[in-house]
Amino acid sequence: LAITSCYEDKGNYDYREMNDIEISVETESSFYALGDKVISKPELVFTLGKENSDLSYEWTFDGHVIGDTKDLEWIADTIASTKELRLAVLDNNTGVTYFGSTYISVSSAYASNGWVVLSEKEGNSTLSFLREQTEEGILKPVVTRDIYSMINGVPMGTQPVSMYPHWTERWDGEDKTSWLWVAQKGGQGAIDISGSSYKQEGILSQMFLSKSYPEGFVSVGVIDMQFLTMAIGEDGTIYTRVKDSNLLFNSSNFLDRPLTSDKEGKIKVDGSMIAYAPFDEHGGMVLYDKNSAQYLHIADYKNWQGYNYSGKVLPLKVEEYEYGPSDARLDNMKDYSVYFVGASLVDWGDISYMSIIKDKAGKFYMQKFKVEAYGGGSSVTKVGASFISQSEIKGLDAVIDGTSKNCFYLCRNQDKAPYLFISKGETLYFYYTDGNKLYTCAQFDSPIASIDAECFNNKYIIVDTI
């Protein structure tokens, strides 16, 4: 909110007491989407206590005239970030103009707060956008269906699998709204889509050195970090590229050789269980590699001298005294099956991880550990980690029993939402991570396909059913 009072001298030198005007301009919000109604009912305060009757009004936004009445009702039609919404009030008796203003932003209707849903309809991949809107405190999203086809004029593809956003530079990047990597098995395969306009921006296969996928590769996910991008195949094989600049979403090419964990380059890293963590201060991401039966840190870090360590594969280092006699070792999980690993933010740099594991006797456990931020260095061969606990989860064997698909979602903000959501068929459960208890949360009419709560303080949970 900005309150100003000023006037222009029009050369009227009749000396008399001026009935100056102080103008206060307020709006219901500071952020709008194209097509939203912007309403403002300004408050005018007259210094002599009596309102002038002969006044003219002019509203402008970013320098463009949008209204000529005292109260504003304007359908936002101009995209602009943090621009002045100004009311000019002309006193026709004196020729003096007074001003009041505030600052608002208008974005694409598809770049505002909300959710993008990837689904399949009549054999085709589709994207829908759910713009966040509440009515009397109740969430009632505005839904735009099949937005990709609407914008691009052609179907997106077939057999959709996953969707991940690009890492976005806070100040100087291409698009603060980010772009979206959509992986699909049919059509063009994985494609890159603008998160603002929903126009197609790229095709994964054309970003390999050979301008085509490596033999046998079928993309099921593309995960983009600040410098490193990982293209993941349905067999878990990972192909990587290191971007030339973190200001660009796509620069340089993917290597045609897979990511490996050994010096000889023979043991491929499995990317089917990545603890996706959109926190660039961590210097990479952690995954569980079933090929070597251990957790690995995949580096994403460039130092101030310009040396880029992105793409290095580093085991975790935990001091042996931190483990109990029966705890699973993070660098040797051969006696356990790992069903899920997720990440949550703790402090600047350090990331907390939680895994669902099962021993050979069929008991399920919650495994908690913390991984330090990776800071590069040619002599660094392992990333420091701290083992926190391993607790049995009673009743989980009835949820993860192999009879139906299980979906998992660990809330990022564990201080506000200490939950891990798990689905089985039509039933949604939540595991209370602070209290080590499993609860039934909700029942749906059809099987659950995905769970998401990626919003401020995890205040909403979105459940997609088949």
Where are these regions (language model features)?
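C-terminal motif of bacterial Sec signal peptides marking the signal peptidase cleavage site
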Residues: 2-5
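Beta-rich, blade/repeat-based domains predominating
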Residues: 157-164, 219-220, 336-343, 396-411, ...
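Terminal low-complexity/disordered tails
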Residues: 354-357, 361, 400-413, 417-428
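Acidic/polar, low-complexity intrinsically disordered N-terminal segments immediately downstream
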Residues: 7-154, 458, 464-465
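Entry beta-strands of beta-propeller and related beta-repeat scaffolds
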Residues: 110-116, 177-180, 229, 285, ...
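Preference for solvent-exposed, low-hydrophobicity sequence contexts
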Residues: 145, 170-398, 439
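Short coil turn/linker residues within repeat-based beta-strand modules
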Residues: 94, 134, 371-373, 435-438
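Conserved blade-ending motifs and adjacent loop-strand segments that build the rim/top face
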Residues: 384-409, 436-462
